[in-house]
A protein has these predicted regions:
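Charged, alpha-helical interface segments at or near domain boundaries
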Residues: 2-186
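C-terminal, beta-strand-rich globular interaction domains
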Residues: 172-276
């Protein structure tokens, strides 16, 4: 039976303090579930139902170290088709995409993807939203120790030569997941579309004056959005691809802002868009 694996390291930055066992276990369970489910989706290009959890993509505990609690674990893929797909795309690309989906679930701008990772992601366009929805509760579980004890948690991919930091969760990312509010009054922004999923109407924009992109979706059912608006968003992404700053074209977007407990905008719910 073909078996492939990817090595990871999870570190709870607790300093000299002992880690509460219950909170630590819930945090690790969240990481295990989010990573395994995301991997299953990437390698099968399907989203498993909440009633089924793949036995052939599992996280296995390895050795642990004491002090800022560090836990090594191995993601083991025993299904021959998924194993072959992992060998084809490589551990690095898989890790990029795991990071991408978990960052999106946290309303955090993901790191830029390599061309190879972008190519794999493009084939998942129809299920991107479903993957994020599927892991959302696991991502909340990942934050148990950050919410309870304010400890950051860092995930790294391990290789024989070095470790690669994938992402960090902390109080700030936790604030994006709990007690979100949506403004009752709409706002107008000038923005460019930086990523757009034509199947779901979601993804990211960069508003004038901002340094990071913010996710968006339409406030109503995507099936009810006018074709002209969908085309406008898609064309803006295409028109601004690899052009000089002075040639960038912006859209005037009306939206309701979704905010975290700090008042920061984590998502725009779009009501309308037009050319200025």
């Amino acid at each position: 039976m073909a078996v492939t694996d990817v090595d990871f390291e999870l570190k709870i930055e607790s300093g000299a303090n002992l880690v509460d066992m219950e909170y630590g276990l819930e945090t690790m369970t969240g990481f295990s579930g989010a990573i395994a489910i995301t991997t299953d989706c990437i390698l099968s290009n399907e989203v498993p139902s909440k009633m089924s959890y793949s036995d052939n993509v599992r996280a296995k505990l390895m050795g642990a170290c004491i002090g800022s609690y560090k836990q090594d674990f191995k993601l083991v893929i025993s299904d021959p088709v998924k194993s072959a797909n992992l060998k084809r795309i490589g551990n690095s690309v898989l890790s990029e995409l795991i990071t991408y989906f978990i960052c999106e679930a946290m309303y955090v701008e993901p790191p830029a993807l390599t061309k190879k990772a972008e190519k794999v992601l493009s084939k998942m366009e129809k299920i991107e939203n479903k993957v994020i929805d599927r892991i959302s509760e696991r991502v909340k579980d990942m934050h148990k120790i950050s919410r309870s004890n304010k400890y950051p948690v860092v995930l790294k991919r391990k290789t024989k030569l070095r470790n690669f930091k994938l992402f960090e969760i902390n109080e700030n990312t936790a604030s994006n997941l709990f007690n979100l509010t949506t403004d009752s009054n709409s706002i107008e922004i000038d923005a460019i579309v930086t990523r757009f999923n034509s199947f779901t109407g979601n993804w990211r924009l960069l508003a004038d004056g901002d340094s990071v992109t913010i996710p968006f979706s339409f406030s109503g059912p995507y099936s009810k959005v006018k074709a002209s608006i969908k085309r406008l968003m898609s064309e803006n992404l295409h028109d601004n691809n690899a052009v000089a700053d002075e040639l960038i074209t912006r859209l005037k977007i009306t939206a309701n802002a979704k905010r975290n407990t700090s008042g920061d905008i984590v998502k725009y719910m779009i009501l309308g868009a037009s050319k200025p």
